[in-house]
Amino acid sequence: MTDSLIIFPAIDLKEGHVVRLSEGDMDRATIYDDDPAARARQFYEAGARYLHVVDLDGAFAGHAMNAAAVDAIVKAFPGTIELGGGIRDMNAIDGWLSRGISRVVIGTAAFENPDLVKEAAQKYPGQIVVAVDARDGMVTTKGWAEQSEISVTDMAERFADAGVVALLYTDVGRDGLKKGCNSEATLALAAATDIPVIASGGVKDIGDIELLARHTKDGIEGVICGRAIYDGSLDLKAALAIARQGGASA
């Protein structure tokens, strides 16, 4: 667990492009860049040392679909890269971690096959993140397309002793809409588990960063920032500065 909030700029990949979805809907994708590696390099030059990458096509297909773009990002961003999307077996985990990815995010497979997570966390300590994607407090799977009857806290409890490095909590109903991060639900999850929590979904502006940065001692490890950065309502350098200052405005 770091002392200050980790800012993860997000690069979501669809057919090799950098996009953002609204509420996880592939038909509501906005293209922001045709050069993912260049965008990753910009984030690094702005001061980011962590990056969150999602293979959106892979999330729906169940296997890697944007490998070339991810490889280019790895070369362009010398920091810590976290990757999710379609990682559903040990071969995929082995493959990505051997190609320079620092941490892999397991979502649907964690729900369907918890033993995979436990095996992977033993094999790769500090490199396995479990995605807890939820709508109205209930877990969603398969690219957010299917709703389960499992609560967020029940999902977290499954991995209490698995050795995962973090839980990535996404409020699907807010993702890509800039409605503001669901800090109440995120903090509730952090309070219910000893696993560090990464917040995602709906980050609107610096106010979300200030709030979350004040709760690193309460189990909040980081926050994923996507559309707000691309649309300009959140300045990455300012967010990084606020995170370093523990939520205090400069």
From Swiss-Prot:
E.C. number(s) listed in UniProt: 5.3.1.16
Keyword Isomerase: yes
Localization, UniProt: Cytoplasm
UniProt keyword list: Amino-acid biosynthesis, Cytoplasm, Histidine biosynthesis, Isomerase
InterPro entries, per database record: Aldolase_TIM, His_biosynth, HisA_bact_arch, Isoase_HisA-like, Isoase_HisA-like_bact, RibuloseP-bd_barrel
Catalytic residues (UniProt): 12, 133
Domain of life: Bacteria
Family the UniProt entry places it in: Belongs to the HisA/HisF family.
Protein known as: 1-(5-phosphoribosyl)-5-[(5-phosphoribosylamino)methylideneamino] imidazole-4-carboxamide isomerase
Organism: Zymomonas mobilis subsp. mobilis (strain ATCC 31821 / ZM4 / CP4)
